[in-house]
Design a protein with these regions (language model features):
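Juxtadomain coupling helices with adjacent low-complexity linkers
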Residues: 1-33, 37-39, 125, 131-154
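Structured interaction and signal-relay segments at domain junctions
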Residues: 39-104
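Sensory/regulatory domains in signal-transduction proteins
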Residues: 97-135, 140
Length: 154
């Protein structure tokens, strides 16, 4: 299902979309933008922005439930462990195998789209996470919105 071209595309996106600054207000603005994008999506989504281990923004659209919260927890763990998108973790696992114990732990980690790393001034600082759509659509909505916000700050 996945290939090296997708892995390269994800790596380039992660290496490009890095913030010079990102604070509490940015978390609110980005989270609100993700929620607004989710309101236009065909299914409801949940949104979370984490910075320095703190959840600075979290919102659940009507129709989401505890399952979405559970998926966001898994995606957050995956992004925090890898410093990459949760989709990249899925692609690498499929292409190269589950070599590390965490790569076989689907109870605690997510191997699907919906988690994006937040790098600030060159350092990994947190994640933007959504849940609710089919995972590739989660990834697309998330990446498009994060990239748009990043471009607005340049």
């Amino acid at each position: 299902m996945y290939d090296e071209a997708l892995l390269q595309e994800l790596t380039e996106l992660e290496n490009t979309v890095r913030f010079d600054s990102f604070d509490f207000n940015d978390a609110y603005v980005l989270g609100s933008a993700l929620r607004a994008a989710g309101e236009k999506a065909p299914k409801p989504i949940a949104v979370r922005i984490v910075l320095d281990g703190m959840i600075l923004y979290q919102s659940f659209l009507p129709g989401t439930d505890a399952t979405n919260n559970n998926w966001m927890d898994k995606k957050q763990r995956t992004v925090q462990l890898t410093g990459t998108t949760s989709l990249r973790a899925a692609v690498e696992r499929e292409l190269y195998g589950a070599k590390a114990p965490w790569q076989r732990d689907e109870e605690h980690y997510a191997f699907c789209g919906g988690g994006f790393p937040l790098y600030v001034d060159g350092q990994f600082r947190g994640a933007a996470i959504i849940s609710g759509l089919p995972h590739l659509k989660d990834h697309a909505l998330l990446c498009e919105t994060v990239k748009d916000y990043w471009e607005s700050k340049k």
